[in-house]
Amino acid sequence: TGKVDPVSTPDRVLFVGEEYRPAFHGHVYFLDMKDHLLSPFASAYEGTAIHSLYPSNTDIFRLAERQGAFRGYVHPYGGENDPNGGENPSLGGAKAFPVDAALGTVEALEMSYGNHAAYIVWHHMLNNDIKIIPTGGEDSISNLYRTAIVGQLRTYVHLGDRPLSWDNWMTGLRKGHTIVTNSPLPVLT
C-alpha cells in the first residue's frame, strides 16, 4: 500500500514489504515501496511455467528503486566457509549478490543464520569499498518446524533523538545505523 499499517502504535510500526523469489539468482526484499508490488513474484524454477531466468535481480532492483524502495538480499549464505572462494565455491543462495553490489543496485545483505558465511561475504564488500548495510531477519515459515522462529534475528536501527516512526526508521536504516543480532535483546545506552 505504500503506507504504515493501521495496527501500528507509537511503540510498534508495521509496514509490509515484498520478497522476490528467483530460484537461481537469490531471494531479495524491498522495503518502503510507494506504489505497487512488483511482478513476477518468482522466476527460474526449473521445470515449471516460471522457468525463465528473466527478470534478473538487477532488473527487479532497478524497478524497485524507481519507487524509492530499500533493496537487499535475504537468507543469502549458509555455513561457515566463504561461498565465493576456496576449493569449491558455490556462490551460495545469493549468486547474483556480488554483481548487484558492484553495480550499486542492492543496499543490504541480510544476516539470516547463526553462521559466518554472510559475514565473510559482507567483509569482502567492505574490503572493496562497497557499502552494504547489514540487516537481520530469518526465513521464518511459521508452520514449518525446521525454520527459525519469528524474531530470532533482528535489525535494530539507531534513531538518535527522533521518535519512532516508519520514516525515521527508514532514514536510519538507509544511513546504515543498524545492529544485527540473534542474541537476547540488547540494552543500548
Predicted regions and their residues:
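Short acidic, glycine/proline-enriched helix-loop-strand junctions
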Residues: 2-13
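Charged catalytic cores and adjacent phosphate/nucleic-acid-binding surfaces used
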Residues: 4, 16-44, 79-189
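Conserved beta-strand positions in the central sheet of alpha/beta enzyme cores
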Residues: 72-73, 110
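Divalent metal-dependent hydrolysis catalytic cores, especially in the metallo-beta-lactamase
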Residues: 1, 70-72
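Anion (oxyanion) recognition and catalysis
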Residues: 8, 65, 126-127
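Residue-level detector of anion-binding/catalytic polar loops
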Residues: 13, 70, 131
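Binuclear metal-dependent hydrolase catalytic cores centered on His/Asp/Glu-rich metal-binding motifs
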Residues: 31-66
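Divalent metal-binding pocket/active-site signature
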Residues: 62-63, 74-78
